[in-house]
C-alpha cells in the first residue's frame, strides 16, 4: 500500500485529507509542522507528501528544501496544498522541488488527479 504523509498545522485539514487519501488507497501518517514531518521522513520515507505552506516551527517550503537534500528525499511526490495562490509562491514551490500545487479548499477528485499526474 502506498503511504502519504499529510503535513498541516490544522487538525481539521489533516482529518479531511486523511479521509480522502484513505478512500483512494493510501496509508496515512500525519505531522503538524515541518520539523515533525522531517523526523517522520528520516524514519520512513513516504511515497507522497501533502504539504501546507504556512506552519509553525518550519514552513512547508523550508521542509521541502530540507527534504530534497536528504538521502532518498528526491523520491516522494510532494503536492503543496495551501491558501497561497499567487504565482510567486507557486513558482517558488516548483523550483524547490514540489511536483504539484493545489489551492485550499480541495476535494478528493483534485487530490487524486494531482497524485496521478505526478505518477502515483
Regions found by a protein language model. Name each.
Residues 44-50:
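Active-site beta3 strand of CheY-like receiver
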Residues 55:
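Receiver (REC) domain active-site loop signature in two-component systems and cognate sites
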Residues 25-32, 40:
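Short hydrophobic/Thr-rich beta-strand motif most characteristic of the beta2 strand and flanking loop
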Residues 62, 85-100, 113:
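Alpha4 helix (beta4-alpha4-beta5 surface) of REC/receiver domains from two-component response regulators
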Amino acid at each position: 500500500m502506498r503511504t502519504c504523509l499529510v503535513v498541516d498545522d490544522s487538525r481539521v485539514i489533516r482529518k479531511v485529507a486523511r479521509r480522502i487519501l484513505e478512500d483512494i488507497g493510501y496509508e496515512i501518517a500525519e505531522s503538524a509542522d515541518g520539523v515533525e514531518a522531517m523526523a517522520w521522513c528520516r524514519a520512513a520515507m513516504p511515497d507522497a507528501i501533502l504539504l501546507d505552506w504556512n506552519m509553525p516551527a518550519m514552513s512547508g517550503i523550508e521542509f521541502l528544501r530540507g527534504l530534497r537534500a536528504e538521502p532518498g528525499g528526491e523520491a516522494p511526490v510532494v503536492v503543496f496544498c495551501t491558501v497561497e495562490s499567487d504565482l510567486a509562491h507557486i513558482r517558488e514551490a516548483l523550483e524547490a522541488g514540489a511536483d504539484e500545487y493545489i489551492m485550499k479548499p480541495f476535494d478528493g477528485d483534485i487530490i487524486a488527479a494531482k497524485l496521478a499526474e505526478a505518477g502515483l
